[in-house]
């Protein structure tokens, strides 16, 4: 796939198990980086579900436009931020990189720092695995249960196996994050799962890093 010399960082949010908060995390991270940290970015939504990034933005837009008072408040809010809302593009996984690079080429003055990709809920097809290899970094949330861990390790192994068969790949790290942790669950269980994942990934992949999102 085509890459440009001044390409920004490509950050993907991916998960093999639905309902772990992938899209929610992607939206939170995008908003914090853009509105609070002044990171110039746009989002490519590859998730075609009803709760996708793009469809959520469309629903929010319709809600604001239908209420004059809310519309006025939002204009004042963005004026105070001195920023407009970040752009969200919708794309099929197979065309996501091409569409992102095309948008970057058409807006050279924007000088984007980051492009965030919200992957579909299940990244098991060859197109989605290929898209994974085109990322610089992937954030993959997981829950402290066996099903989530097995799905996560299977995904990592698939990305690694495909990557080593290619002459060059872009991916640098897959960062695993504990999410939706039940605070009633003992720390020892999370620590055990963390050690287990680190041991398993040592044998199947060399670019995986595990971090703990929620400290109990």
Q: Where are the language model's segments positioned?
A:
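Glycine-rich phosphate-binding loop used to anchor ATP phosphates in small-molecule kinases
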Residues: 108-127
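Hydrophobic positions on the alpha1 helix immediately C-terminal to the Walker A/P-loop
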Residues: 24-25, 29
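Gly/Ala-rich phosphate-binding loop of Rossmann-like dinucleotide-binding domains
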Residues: 30, 34-35, 132
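Phosphate-binding P-loop
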Residues: 2-8
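Conserved C-terminal guanine-recognition region of P-loop GTPase G domains, centered on the G4
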Residues: 152-168
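Inter-motif core of Ras-like GTPase G domains
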Residues: 110, 126-146
């Amino acid at each position: 796939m085509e890459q440009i010399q001044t390409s920004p960082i490509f950050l993907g949010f991916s998960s093999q198990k639905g309902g772990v908060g992938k899209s929610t995390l992607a939206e939170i991270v995008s908003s914090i980086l853009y509105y609070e940290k002044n990171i110039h970015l746009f989002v490519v939504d590859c998730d075609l579900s009803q709760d996708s990034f793009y469809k959520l933005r469309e629903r929010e837009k319709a809600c604001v436009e239908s209420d004059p008072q809310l519309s006025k408040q939002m204009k004042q809010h963005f004026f105070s931020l001195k920023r407009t809302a970040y752009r969200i593009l919708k794309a099929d996984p197979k065309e996501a990189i091409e569409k992102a690079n095309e948008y970057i080429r058409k807006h050279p003055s924007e000088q984007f720092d980051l492009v965030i990709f919200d992957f579909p809920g299940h990244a098991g097809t060859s197109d989605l695995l290929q898209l994974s290899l085109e990322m610089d970094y992937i954030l993959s949330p997981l829950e402290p249960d066996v099903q989530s861990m097995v799905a996560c390790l299977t995904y990592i192994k698939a990305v690694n196996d495909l990557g080593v068969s290619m002459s060059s790949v872009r991916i640098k790290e897959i960062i695993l994050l504990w999410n939706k942790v039940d605070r009633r669950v003992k720390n020892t269980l999370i620590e055990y799962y963390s050690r287990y994942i680190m041991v398993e990934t040592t044998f199947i992949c060399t670019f995986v890093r595990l971090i703990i999102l929620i400290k109990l």
